[in-house]
Amino acid sequence: MQMVKSSFDVTPEGRLVSYRGYESNVIVPTGVTEIGERAFWGARLMTRLTLPASLRVIGAWGFAGCTSLREVASFGGVTDIGAHAFFSCTALAEVWLPPTVRRIGAAAFDGCATLGFLSLPEALTDIGDMAFRGCRSLRRVSVSPKNRMFYEREGVLFDRCGQLVRYPPGRDAFAYTVPPGVHSLADGAFSEATMLREVGLPGSLTRIGQGAFYRAKHLRSLDLPPRVTEIGAEAFGACEALARVGLPCGLTTVPPLAFFGCAGLTDVALPPGVTKIGEGAFLGCRSLRSVTAGRLRVVGENAFSDCVSLRSVSATALPRVGTSGNEAFFTAAAQKNPRGG
């Protein structure tokens, strides 16, 4: 065995609670059944990892911050990968999960910036929210054809309940059309898809998740289908090139930070049913000139903050003083006359 025993702190029950070694090639001893929370946190010298067949659980943040880790030679017999387990493993290039894996926790591979390929097994039944957020180099997801919960089409990950789970942001395509029948875009589904200029959405779509298009910075325009009634916070945040968005008639709320940092957005027409604009919804939309709305009841804090080009906010009704955020129009050019003309 290449490791000295003092490198690992293992309980009698087989839980590895901490690693104190400095090796580049780390082989976790046979008999370990669980990697404890933050056990390998910041083990920056580790480049290669081998896990034993006895392993069942990788705890939350287990290998987070292992920024030199390039290869997991074996995941052993792991069934459960905890939240943020491989957070910010920025050198990790490929992940081939074993047939035993059933669950991937929320943000498990968040920030794995060079991860290019991901293989998911037959047994997998649960993928947590934003499990692959920040994997901006991801080009393809492969799923076992025997998996009953998930499948891939042209390298894009879907579940069998009608949700697009993850579009690989490292693909070099300029356009993508979501297939008919998809009714939901998962949280972070298209986040950091920086090559995309156009995305076609199906009429079946009803929900757009939190941060769904976050930092899709070359996306130019988007038409949301009429059935969409739910849009998550930050859904279009930091889409710098987004100049036009068509919003559906059934929308009642613009969520917090929905369009923050959309520097190319110039004019927005809100559907007549929208009564609430969330906090920071248009924060930093520096080219935004006009907003047309219906009967607004609530305008959140900083909703139009730093909208330096804003000249007009027109609505059939606007909130009384005190029902809009104290800094809703802070630094906006329309601050002196936020009700527009």
Feature annotation, model-predicted:
Residues 37-39, 59-62, 83-85, 105-108, ...:
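Consensus positions within tandem repeat domains that build extended binding/scaffold surfaces
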Residues 1-14, 20-34, 44-57, 67-80, ...:
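Structural signature of tandem-repeat unit edges
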